[in-house]
């Protein structure tokens, strides 16, 4: 979002038939991919705004349930003239699957929720950090969540676990970046 690239110069073929987008677009694409990967990219995830209505004695269970799912309470207040307590929270969509069922179980069916899309938020962690070791059948720690999401998505699509910058640079440019210690992944 909000990225702008300016092409300052290009040497095109002399023959008019050989000139065109096919000469510039692949080179520009490789340069932009490499720029994004060397700029420590981050993943974004959708976040729901959740409104939960329940009796006041169920609020502690709601807080516990939201805390286990990376949710955060934005506001809570009783509804005037009723025994109902209203809690507004932000909950990542990734952690919202099964939330309503868990909410009903935790409150013996006394609470119900309404979820709507609210915003995009940065997923914690660096998706390109190779130092993070992911173990099968174990939840990733919060600092490794972005890495886990990227690796699982790449595996599902049949791609290698890691992105290699070498495919976006020519050998001389790659050697120059390595000498500058850019941290090639």
Residues of each region from the PLM?
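Accessory interaction regions appended to the cores of large information-processing enzymes
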Residues: 1-185
């Amino acid at each position: 979002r909000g990225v702008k690239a300016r092409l300052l110069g290009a040497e095109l073929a002399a023959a008019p038939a050989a000139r065109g987008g096919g000469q510039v677009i692949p080179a520009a694409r490789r340069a932009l991919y490499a720029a994004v990967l060397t700029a420590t990219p981050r993943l974004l995830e959708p976040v729901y705004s959740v409104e939960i209505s329940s009796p006041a004695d169920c609020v502690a269970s709601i807080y516990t349930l939201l805390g286990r799912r990376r949710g955060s309470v934005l506001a809570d207040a009783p509804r005037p003239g009723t025994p109902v307590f209203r809690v507004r929270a932000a909950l990542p969509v990734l952690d919202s699957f099964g939330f309503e069922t868990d909410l009903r179980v935790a409150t013996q069916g006394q609470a119900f929720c309404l979820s709507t899309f609210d915003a995009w938020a940065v997923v914690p962690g660096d998706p390109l950090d190779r130092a993070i070791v992911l173990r099968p059948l174990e939840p990733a720690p919060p600092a490794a969540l972005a890495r886990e999401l990227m690796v699982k998505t790449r595996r599902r699509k049949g791609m290698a676990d890691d992105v290699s910058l070498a495919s976006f640079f020519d050998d001389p440019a790659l050697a120059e970046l390595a000498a500058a210690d850019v941290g090639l992944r």
